[in-house]
Curated annotation (Swiss-Prot):
Interacts with cognate CdiA-CT but not CdiA-CT from D.dadantii strain 3937. CysK forms a complex with CdiA-CT/CdiI. One CdiA toxin subunit binds to each subunit of the CysK homodimer, and one CdiI immunity protein binds to each toxin subunit; the immune complex is thus a dimer of trimers. This is Immunity protein CdiI. InterPro entries: CdiI. CDD domains: CdiI_EC536-like. It comes from Escherichia coli O6:K15:H31 (strain 536 / UPEC).
Length: 128
């Protein structure tokens, strides 16, 4: 099973937990979690932090196939996170990203608010 530690390498946290930021605590919590077990919240945060974007795409596709408006804090949060990536972040998973794009473009217009519509437009402009 692939984890962030296997992808990034061994990262030594030198701070005591009470000295760590919430981001550091989160990263320490998920670094050994298999990518296929990451939650929607973890995927959103990892994408926003630009962590292993390419390797996360199969899990993102799996989640969005089951729940196209997946989000921990609001509907469409995962789509919003995807709108922040750059085409160069996608190396081996360009076809997976294309599938993700096709999937979100099939959402019913009545299910999409203005912010989500803007995020989808950004995703459609990502060159792969």
């Amino acid at each position: 099973m692939i984890t962030l530690r296997k992808l990034i390498g061994n990262i030594n946290m030198t701070k005591e937990p009470e000295q760590q930021s919430p981001l550091e605590l989160w990263f320490e919590r998920i670094i050994d979690v298999p990518l296929e077990k990451l939650t929607v919240e973890d995927l959103c945060r990892a994408i926003r932090q630009n962590l292993c974007i390419d390797q996360l795409m199969p899990r993102v596709l799996e989640v969005l196939t089951k729940e196209p408006l997946a989000g921990e804090y609001y509907d469409g949060e995962l789509i919003a996170a995807l709108s922040t990536i750059k085409g160069e972040d996608l190396k081996d998973q360009k076809s997976t990203f294309t599938q993700i794009r096709q999937l979100i473009n099939q959402l019913e217009p009545s299910d999409i608010n203005d912010d989500l519509r803007k995020d989808i437009l950004k995703i459609n402009q990502i060159i792969v």
